[in-house]
Amino acid sequence: PRPSPPRRAGAGPDGRPSPLGAAPARLAPMRRAVCPGSFDPLHKGHVEVIARAANLFEEVVVAVSSNPAKTYRFSVDERIAMIEATVSSLAGVAVRPMGPGLLAEFCRQIGADAIVKGLRGGADLEFEAPMAAMNRHLTGVETVYLPADARYTHVSSSLIKEVHGLGGDVAEFVPAAVLRGLDGGA
């Protein structure tokens, strides 16, 4: 067989021009990801996304955010303790407070390659896409979306707090450490 002619710059594997013009740069492997959130409280949907991220990246930093303009059920330290108790068996996962600054800046400070976000549906994507674009613009950090497990597409921290506050059983949707916290235990 005849050797293939060299590929022209901007050409696809078949030699035709790429629809993107010049061939896109090959991305370096992503090693450290941030799973950000307020996690007030952490629920099993969050845990499932964190566990999947731990299978995709060498390191995952669960960044616990705090906005001074918001009221939280649990302090940052309480949220961190509940998350650590839940994810302690996952290799390569660390939990850190993020503070009130930009997520993009936090990613730059810790050398993160990616932000991992779970999506429950289209509304989540509409909310997350502009933030992902801004984070990429500010630091070049890519956002990786993981679709939520079907068991948890209806679960949110706000709904957990509301249902629990009205006496409903949320044990199926939160880790044991969170249930103890919601019930007033440590």
Predicted regions span which residues?
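Nucleotidyltransferase catalytic core that binds NTPs
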Residues: 24-186
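Compositionally biased, low-complexity flexible segments
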Residues: 1-26
